[in-house]
Amino acid sequence: MKYLTDEKLLIVGAGGMIGSNMAQTALMLGLTPNVCLYDIFEPGVHGVAEEMYHCAFEGANITWTVDPAEAFKDAKYIISSGGAPRKEGMTREDLLKGNCQIAAQFGDYIKEYCPDVKHVVVIFNPADVTALTALIHSGLKPSQLTSLAALDSTRLQSNLAKEFGVPQSKVTAAYTYGGHGEAMAVFASKTLIDGTPLAEKNLSAERWAEIKHATVQGGSAIIKLRGRSSFQSPAYNAVKMIEADMGGTKFTWPAGCYVNCDECGFKNVMMAMPTVIDVAGVHFTKPEGTPEEMAELQASYEHLCKMRDEIVSLGIVPPVDEWKKSNPNL
């Protein structure tokens, strides 16, 4: 089997549903034979490792551990789902304090054991703030750490495809930006449905509002249907993000990235933007939309600022003007 690289990929939270799916997806896509599975729950991560062995992936070197020093040492790529999952009735923001404390420790492990890591993807919620926490603590460059945000856009794409009875790939330029949560901003002014602008499809305002609501509540809908939070879609998209940095297909769905941009008017947050991930990391451009879309994005940014300020007040990260002491790259 041919692999993109032989460098070490670390899956954090590998004993869980997302983590185990990430491990299998990474090996099925041929990212690297050297995959380390890490979790604090030994029976879970041991069980996942055994299942991976039973898949008999050609040339694979799968290891597992509950020791962070062993796990993080020499890791060049990391995906972390190592936080508490969302349960029915919870918002992503409800997970803020506990998961940001986990993210702080995660960032500290990176700084201590694998400062030469190439790219890190954080996918445990609230992803914008856990990723920001990890970035501050890790010392990495902003281009080296991203958070999963693509699911909001793929859910929008899926909802529009179902609405108009077209293959999902025929819905283009349907994106969400800003926060990965209730305050996400939906951008559809440039959306095409099989080549036809959405604005020309005679969609009523009421129906469009329903589609937007279904997009924002897409994760909650999965919990109600399956009794647990999403795991297959986040696992696949997170692995595709890492694949892009390894030199595979560029990842062009929106990713959460660090934004400190006077031109954009957004300062010191992680948020979903128009992005590309490639071997040089993540790059963003300024979003373009209608005045209404830009107002939604501004509101989403302000919500992210409030969550950022909350983790500062909790002492999980230092005040913004002291971030450079923790991470000179910010």
Specify the residue positions occupied by each region the protein language model found.
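Rossmann-like NAD(P)-binding element
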Residues: C55-H119
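C-terminal substrate-binding/catalytic lobe of Rossmann-fold NAD(P)-dependent dehydrogenases
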Residues: S138-S143, S153-L330
